[in-house]
């Protein structure tokens, strides 16, 4: 049975194309300061001093922390573990998972907002970006400007700085499996093994790509934690949210105006809460899985 043909004079039906993936809009978060931002940077320093510093510590005549895969021995300060001791690793992972669930139930997404490597390295890379290209408005202006000497210089400097940090991160990662002093000596003499070259470059590329380009996309689409974290919330969980009863109806007004007499809430609709968000969401739309609870 044939479909009915459109009557003469009627407009032809339009085809609507639906994209399978959302087109990413580049986010330029505004720099923030304050108590929570200070805590976030304190944890950036603490985690990175731990990560970059541990391979340099010695315990007797060996590194304090070394996972010697070829010897099948794992040194953690005075503790020496063998493959048959991996049952202890299972216990550590179980305790870590339960701790994550506990802290999430009590205080929301503390891990995501303050200690997750994706958050930490994104903060570090955005700091480098701000130092070279300027704050939010300057970066947006640079994005929209045509390619010229200034743009090439700033973009090139940013990527060089990112690559230096990423490469050192990759070297540090491999130094947990090969003594760092021996590793640096063989890098200087171009005498690295194939697997060492692979893991240095792989970890460097992952750091550069995730923290420099993908950023909030990792939190939105790749990390499974965001999808089920709401199941760990209850009525007593501390969360970062918008107080609609206080803020609505939103609207601009002069500083001296009384919002109640104008029929307005406390929100002046300035949009700064959106500009400072590292995942680019509008917190006024309610609890969203994209929110990492950073309290920016």
Give residue spans per PLM region.
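Short, flexible, mixed-charge glycine/proline-rich loop motifs
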Residues: 103-107, 209-215, 258-261, 265-269, ...
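Membrane-embedded alpha-helical bundles of multi-pass integral membrane proteins
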Residues: 2-250, 274, 295-296
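Membrane-embedded translocation segments of transport machinery
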Residues: 244-266
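Structured cytosolic domains appended to multi-pass membrane proteins
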Residues: 267-268, 274-296
